[in-house]
């Protein structure tokens, strides 16, 4: 019994001792300092409550996250990513939800003259059954001596088909189908003169049409002119560029000229013959007044005769002829042009207005000016990262109009 009592007393003393008044003495030379203190009990629930009160609400933390997302941190971080998600829409894919990771980085963080490299990872799913994932980017090596531009993506898209040529897109009834598309493309460039590059391009693409809406009537075969519903092609080519743009995704000044010749060998696909494609781009950017950029774009693509339907030039996408259903007007060749005024309005918010035109045709000797289609529209911009914009455009065309939500400037 005495032992139990001693143990209980010892336990009580050990628990109560921290809360009892304690005396300490410090001696310094001939002086002695005596003091007595009593530790106060700590209320753990109050401390936790204060911590919870100091924690910002989710919405405020989200605002803080995006407030700093447009600051250039490429000199202090290996790669500076910003993540975003929200609704997406285009005339081709309808309403959906998109996720995006936009990153900026520098391979040489001691080089403050060269523009940073960029990469975008994206995923999208829509109520119409679209799903797509991919990555695209531009890697700029030290002192901009070399460049690597790349795109890797897969998409499954319910689409409409009108056939080939201006008259088909204008007057035919659409046939619905699902298009599965795989694309891998890389363009490696080497600087040979100031702002002048030459390089090679390598691409692989596979497209398959499935679930045609009129399979019983087989009228879609008329639109395909007897071609197969699936094609695979591997492209090899040469690129020559002149590029004085200050930043590829969103230039404020400079000129960009690109000429590319690509061949698709018969033995590296199932197209049945060797094909070729010629592409030309000419872009110019000039500041016209404070925070306002005037941008111009000329684009042309020419495919060889007998190019399969999935590889034809398709008018209307998130870069050119915005507002048209992509592929309603399709043919061997296409020429488009547009001029856009880009104005920063307040802090990270801006707006745009543009106008342009486009034409699809089978060959230059069959080009018809009366088949030229108009295009114009306006847009809203929000700076997600330093000079990387999220854009909402509304484009108008001939008997058509549509919203478009995307990332980076159209050109």
Model feature map: region roles:
Residues 236, 241, 245-344:
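C-terminal outer-membrane beta-barrel translocator/porin domains of Gram-negative envelope proteins
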Residues 1-27:
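Bacterial Sec-dependent N-terminal signal peptides
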Residues 80-89, 114-127, 133, 255-267, ...:
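Transmembrane beta-strand segments that form the barrel wall of outer-membrane beta-barrel proteins
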Residues 73-82, 89-228, 232, 389, ...:
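Gram-negative/organellar outer-membrane beta-barrel architecture
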Residues 303-391:
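Outer membrane beta-barrel transmembrane domains
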Residues 85-87, 99-103, 135-139, 184-190, ...:
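Residues on the lipid-exposed face of transmembrane beta-strands in outer-membrane beta-barrel proteins
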Residues 81-83, 117-121, 147-152, 197-200, ...:
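Transmembrane beta-strands of outer-membrane beta-barrel proteins
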Residues 23-149, 227-251, 343-351, 360-362, ...:
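Outer-membrane beta-barrel initiation region
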């Amino acid at each position: 019994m005495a032992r139990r009592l001693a143990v209980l007393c010892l336990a009580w003393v050990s628990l109560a001792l921290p809360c009892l008044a304690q005396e300490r003495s410090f001696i310094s030379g001939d002086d002695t300092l005596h003091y007595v203190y009593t530790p106060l009990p700590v209320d753990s629930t109050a401390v936790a409550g204060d911590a919870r009160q100091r924690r910002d609400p989710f919405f405020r933390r989200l605002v803080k996250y995006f407030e700093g997302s447009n600051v250039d941190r490429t000199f202090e971080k290996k790669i500076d990513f910003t993540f975003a998600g929200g609704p997406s829409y285009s005339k081709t894919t309808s309403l959906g939800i998109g996720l995006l990771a936009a990153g900026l980085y520098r391979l040489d963080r001691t080089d403050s003259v060269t523009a940073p490299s960029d990469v975008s990872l994206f995923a999208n799913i829509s109520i119409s059954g679209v799903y797509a994932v991919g990555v695209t980017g531009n890697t700029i090596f030290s002192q901009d001596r070399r460049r690597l531009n790349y795109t890797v993506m897969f998409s499954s898209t319910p689409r409409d088909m009108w056939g080939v040529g201006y008259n088909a897109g204008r007057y035919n009834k659409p046939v619905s189908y699902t298009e599965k598309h795989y694309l891998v493309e890389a363009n490696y460039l080497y600087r040979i003169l100031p702002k002048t590059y030459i390089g090679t391009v390598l691409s692989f693409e596979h497209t398959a049409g499935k679930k045609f809406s009129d399979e019983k009537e087989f009228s879609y075969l008329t639109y395909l002119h007897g071609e197969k519903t699936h094609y695979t092609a591997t492209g090899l080519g040469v690129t020559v560029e002149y590029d004085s743009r200050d930043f590829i995704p969103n230039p404020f000044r400079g000129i960009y000229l690109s000429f590319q010749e690509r061949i698709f060998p018969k033995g590296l696909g199932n197209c049945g013959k060797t094909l070729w494609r010629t592409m030309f781009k000419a872009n110019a950017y000039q500041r016209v007044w404070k925070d306002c950029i005037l941008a111009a774009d000329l684009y042309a693509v020419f495919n060889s005769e007998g190019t399969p339907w999935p590889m034809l030039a398709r008018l209307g996408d998130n870069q050119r002829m915005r507002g048209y259903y992509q592929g309603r007007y399709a043919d061997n060749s296409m020429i488009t042009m547009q001029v856009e005024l880009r104005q920063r309005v307040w802090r990270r918010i801006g707006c745009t207005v543009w106008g342009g035109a486009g034409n699809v045709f089978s060959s230059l000797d069959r080009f018809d000016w009366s088949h030229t289609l108009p295009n114009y529209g306006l847009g809203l911009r929000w700076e997600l990262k330093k000079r990387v914009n999220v854009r909402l455009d509304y484009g108008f065309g001939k008997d058509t109009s549509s919203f478009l939500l995307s990332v980076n400037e159209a050109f």
